[in-house]
A protein has these predicted regions:
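Basic polycationic patches enriched in arginine
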Residues: 11, 19-20
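Extreme N-terminal tail/first-helix region
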Residues: 24-54
Length: 219
């Protein structure tokens, strides 16, 4: 359910209608900027993770207030609720990309309120450019969560849209993780894109290699 990556070429020319629509989706109001509910859900999330044996590691460096998050491994529908709870626990302000099918009525409003951005990869769109613009234009902290696998199924190659969003927005890439075997989750290393995609992807995949998703055979 949760998660949809984008490719480098999912872009259109600046000023197009599609550009304005996607940018509006990216900047919509979410549960993370709803004060009372945010506070209550943070208390619930911290308590739930602690009771169920999860350990939340790391914290977001100040220079990463605007950033692109890698979300991996992505192998289960459970990844979304855990991601949301970790975001509350770490006081993040996230938006996440999800496949268009989970945004259909009657769930569209709820999914967008939870920070979702619908992605329809069957159609040409401008998600990379619009997401980068949204990060740059944000008045406060904004973390865009992208699962580079793009699906819960096992894939040979990761999609690179997250990388090009970070390059275009001139923001760092934060490696976040969920390890269901060790029950650890949180924020890992920060990568500043060098422009050498191949070398940077080698470093990213090396970091994620030890982690096990809920369905490890799919990672």
């Amino acid at each position: 359910m949760y998660g949809e990556a984008c490719d480098k070429d999912t872009r259109v020319e600046p000023g197009s209608t599609a550009r304005r629509i996607t940018l509006a989706h990216t900047m919509h109001r979410t549960i993370f900027d709803t004060p009372v509910i945010n506070t209550l859900l943070r208390l619930f999330s911290v308590a739930f993770l602690r009771i169920t044996g999860w350990k939340v590691q790391g914290s977001l460096p100040p220079e990463c207030a605007k950033s692109v998050f890698i979300a991996a491994p992505h192998t289960s529908n459970w990844d979304l609720p855990y991601t949301l709870m970790v975001a509350f626990a770490l006081r993040l302000n996230i938006y996440w990309m999800g496949k268009e099918s989970i945004f259909k009525p009657p769930f569209r409003g709820l999914m967008m309120w939870l920070g979702g951005i619908p992605v329809d990869r069957a159609k040409a769109n401008n998600l990379v450019a619009a997401s980068a613009d949204a990060l740059q234009a944000a008045d406060g902290p904004l973390q865009l969560v992208v699962p580079p696998e793009g699906t819960r199924s096992k894939v040979r190659y990761w999609k690179t849209g997250f990388y090009y969003i970070a390059v275009a927005a001139q923001v760092p890439i934060v490696m976040s993780y969920l390890d269901y075997h060790q029950k650890i989750t949180g924020i890992g290393p920060v990568l500043r894109p060098t422009g050498d995609l191949e070398a940077d992807m080698v470093a990213i995949k090396a970091f994620y290699a030890p982690f096990k998703g809920k369905n490890p055979e799919q990672f």
